[in-house]
Structures are given as C-alpha cells and as structure tokens.
C-alpha cells in the first residue's frame, strides 16, 4: 500500500532515536511542515503520472494524508514538543490552525489533478 507522509516518518525517526531530538525544532517549523506536505503531494502525483502508482492508490494516499492533517497533525505536533521537553529540549512553537487548513486545501487542489 502506498502511503507517503514525511512528517510522520521524520517524527518517528526522532522518537525512535534515529535522529537527534534537536531535529524536532526544525520539523515543527510551520513553513517546513507545509513544505513537507507539499513535497509529499508532488511525489504522490509524480508516481501516478509516471505509472508507478495506480489511481486508486494515489487517491487513497491523498485521502489518508488529508485525514492525518485534519485529525492528527496538531496532536502529533504537541506530542513531539512534549517528547522533546522530556529529553531536556524545550520548543516554543505553536501550530496555527490556518496552516492545517492551508495544507488540507493544497491536498484537495493536487488531488484534483488525478
């Protein structure tokens, strides 16, 4: 099953200790978050256009990505901040609900290209 979600992948790397907890600060930057999801959408679309992914797979990935953004992104954002703080690294960032909306709308726009 195709599922591309760079934010979730990078968060997992930090929690598993594969990446330094200091990386969480960069990961939680709102511009970086938007760029990761934009890049994921482009990668998914390119897989479809190149014939490496079926239409159904791509549509499902967009659906799952949008569902993640709307229902889980802010929760994981806060959990990663808490995790970093438990390791002695305080992060003072907040996730603006408008960023979540922008990402969801972007996914909608790209999804229409399939």
Curated annotation (Swiss-Prot):
Signal peptide span: none
Protein name as annotated: Uncharacterized protein AF_0941
Organism of provenance: Archaeoglobus fulgidus (strain ATCC 49558 / DSM 4304 / JCM 9628 / NBRC 100126 / VC-16)
InterPro entries: AF0941-like_sf (IPR036564), Uncharacterised_AF0941 (IPR013502)
């Amino acid at each position: 099953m195709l599922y591309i979600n760079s934010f979730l992948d990078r968060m997992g790397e930090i929690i598993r200790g594969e990446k330094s907890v200091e990386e969480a600060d960069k990961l939680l930057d709102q511009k970086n978050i938007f760029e990761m999801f934009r890049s994921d959408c482009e990668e998914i679309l390119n897989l479809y256009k190149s014939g490496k992914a079926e239409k159904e797979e791509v549509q499902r990935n967009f659906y799952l990505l949008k569902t993640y953004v709307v229902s889980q992104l802010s929760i994981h954002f806060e959990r990663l901040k808490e995790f970093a703080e438990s390791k002695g690294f305080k992060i003072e960032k907040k996730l603006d609900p408008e960023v979540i909306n922008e990402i969801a709308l972007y996914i909608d726009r790209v999804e229409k290209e399939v």
